[in-house]
From Swiss-Prot:
Organism: Homo sapiens (Human)
Localization annotation: Nucleus; Chromosome
Post-translational modification N6,N6-dimethyllysine, affected residues: K58
Name this protein carries in UniProt: Histone H2B type 1-D
Record key words, sorted: Acetylation, ADP-ribosylation, Chromosome, DNA-binding, Glycoprotein, Hydroxylation, Isopeptide bond, Methylation, Nucleosome core, Nucleus, Phosphoprotein, Ubl conjugation
Gene: H2BC5
């Protein structure tokens, strides 16, 4: 009686690992689609603030969602401000005003000062 052929073990139910590269019919390997995220930048800031602290992938996902949400809110508000003033360009002034409108009190002040510092650093490096 012939032995049953051994195949690769089936992936566990609920396995989160995706197949890295799937084989196409013509033998070429398909590239994995790239997911854009802010995780690299969140990690860099975390290491500046707390060098000995790590972050879980779930927490990183939450931080990524948070940054995307704040970005969309600021961009939307800045767009509205530009439209109200019959402007077709969003400048740092619209962004600054949007931040002042969206963020509460002291948080807005700190965000504006950090933003101004970043813009100054960027323009001086050009």
């Amino acid at each position: 009686m012939p032995e049953p052929t051994k195949s690769a073990p089936a992936p566990k139910k609920g396995s989160k690992k995706a197949v890295t590269k799937a084989q196409k019919k013509d033998g070429k390997k398909r590239k994995r689609s790239r997911k854009e995220s802010y995780s690299v930048y969140v990690y860099k800031v975390l290491k500046q603030v707390h060098p000995d602290t790590g972050i879980s992938s779930k927490a990183m996902g939450i931080m990524n969602s948070f940054v995307n949400d704040i970005f969309e809110r600021i961009a939307g508000e800045a767009s509205r401000l530009a439209h109200y003033n019959k402007r077709s360009t969003i400048t740092s002034r619209e962004i600054q005003t949007a931040v002042r409108l969206l963020l509460p009190g002291e948080l807005a002040k700190h965000a504006v000062s950090e933003g101004t510092k970043a813009v100054t650093k960027y323009t001086s490096s050009k």
